[in-house]
Amino acid sequence: MKINITENIKISMRGYTIINVNAYWEENGRRYAVKACDGLKIDSNDKEVILRGSYDGRNVEWKLCNKGNYITAELTIQSKNEVYIDALCAFRGEIKPEEANQKFLKVPFDNDDWVKFESKEYSKSEMGYGVSAVYNQNGALIIGALEYDIWKTGIIPNECIEVRSGVTDKLTRDTIKHGMVHGEIVKSPVIYIGESRTWQQGMMGFADIYNEYNTRLLWHGPIPFGWNSWYAYMKEIDMDKYMEASKFVSKTNFYDKNVSYINFDAFWNVGLTSEELLKAAEFVKERGQIPGAYIAPFAGWIKEDCIDDYVTYDTGERVRVDGF
């Protein structure tokens, strides 16, 4: 893998060449390209290329590091005063495959709503989330974010492929724009651009590097086995159906270390009274199972006029999230 800075930054990989590589950030609804910064300087060696410049009191640094069979890219905006950044793109470039017929592997943001991985012709593809792949018979290009603690990142397969941090849409389960990230220093996630013989091998390689950047959350309990009401009953769940499921599971080997979960999915708060919920939970416990319900801080179906019945309080004040 080579990074050539004499031709407006070109990256050569297995089966692919990426030309006109650039980066940008968005602020107050406007886009600013790194290469358009004032006083732009380029420092380079065999291992990395660093572009530094400034714009309107902001110091801008864009770093590309050659790691052998993959490259990392990172964009940093720094100012004496806080900056408010809408989005960052630490990698954008025009892909030139040695062979045509390249495809794009779209990776979904999550597994909700029966969403699937999709592989289509590059020109007919849509944004992937977190990590995606461009591939043909000669090789694969894996592009993704190695960090997810601040930004939601999408891989956009346009004429120039770009890795945009600050994406939201219906497939990220958002109905509002990505929030601005602010501070005296605002960084993009570290972006991974790797090559491989196949996209399958490439994804395994990406996972290995991802694990170097992120600590796995270890689970010390038994393997979670259980039953969930949605597939069988959807919104028709009631106490009798739930208890029958508990009986069935108790007669099978669907458990690990004698632990299994019997879970209510959505509509449990409609199909059962409070008394029925308590009775069902006790029924499950008597069989050595653990009862559960589908609810989370960010998955609530609460009517506005009932909000005060559900919110939590801290030191006597109602806890607010994002101003609500």
Model-inferred region functions:
Residues D86, L272-E275, E304-D305:
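A short acidic (Asp/Glu
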Residues M1-D256, R287-I290:
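Carbohydrate-recognition beta-sandwich/jelly-roll modules
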Residues G292-F324:
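Active-site-adjacent "subsite" loops/lids of carbohydrate-active enzymes
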Residues Q201, D240-E244, L272-K279, Y294:
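Generic recognition of stable, solvent-exposed alpha-helical segments in well-folded globular domains
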Residues I223-D240, S260-S274, V319-F324:
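The substrate-binding groove and active-site-proximal loops of carbohydrate-active enzymes
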